[in-house]
Amino acid sequence: MVKIGVLGLQGAVREHVKAIEASGAEAVVVKQVEQLQEIDGLILPGGESTTMRRLIDKYHFMEPLREFARSRKPMFGTCAGMILLANKLIGYEEAHIGAMDITVERNAFGRQKDSFEATLSIKGVGEDFTGVFIRAPYVVDIADDVEVLSMHNGRMVAVKQGPFLAASFHPELTDDYRVTAYFVEMVEEAKMKKVV
């Protein structure tokens, strides 16, 4: 059984833990840098990206998170987590973790009051997935090796690049665990490759 961490500084941590466990993996809430060494994959949950960055800096997580990405262990960023994984952010000088060759626009779907749900088709996951968008970012540009998994109204809302997955929406806020199960499979495959 693979062990998947959820960065536990802010955001929908409990919901991600439930989704991971429902998908047949062990979940760990990561609150200390040392825990990164014990896990096979990591979810960066939604929340407020500037607050999350402040907490990441306060608890000295940034360089260990970049090191985790360099080790090519799978990472999945949802909403604010997508912003953390992007290597370019519209209107900002500096990326955060910068593991994915994507350009992201923050709060692109509007503010909290503009939150909405949309039915999505997600490559590798299936049809009729309810995406919960809360002040959601979206991807405006990608490198050639980034795969677009889902679009909404002509905007890229789920992308994959190697061991990295990012979604504008919150898959953990529904009882449909297919997106989390997709990430669990990515982690299982990556772990098997390391063993071989």
From Swiss-Prot:
Keywords: Glutamine amidotransferase, Hydrolase, Lyase, Pyridoxal phosphate. L-glutamine binds at G47, E48, S49, R106, I134, R135. CDD domains: GATase1_PB (cd01749). Pathway: Cofactor biosynthesis; pyridoxal 5'-phosphate biosynthesis. The active site is at C79 (nucleophile), H170 (charge relay system), E172 (charge relay system). One of its GO terms (cellular component) is cytosol. One of its GO terms (biological process) is pyridoxine metabolic process. It comes from the Bacteria. Its EC number is 4.3.3.6, 3.5.1.2. Gene3D superfamilies: 3.40.50.880. It catalyses: aldehydo-D-ribose 5-phosphate + D-glyceraldehyde 3-phosphate + L-glutamine = pyridoxal 5'-phosphate + L-glutamate + phosphate + 3 H2O + H(+); L-glutamine + H2O = L-glutamate + NH4(+). Belongs to the glutaminase PdxT/SNO family. Catalyzes the hydrolysis of glutamine to glutamate and ammonia as part of the biosynthesis of pyridoxal 5'-phosphate. The resulting ammonia molecule is channeled to the active site of PdxS. HAMAP family: PdxT. In the presence of PdxS, forms a dodecamer of heterodimers. Only shows activity in the heterodimer. This is Pyridoxal 5'-phosphate synthase subunit PdxT. It comes from Bacillus cytotoxicus (strain DSM 22905 / CIP 110041 / 391-98 / NVH 391-98). The gene is pdxT.
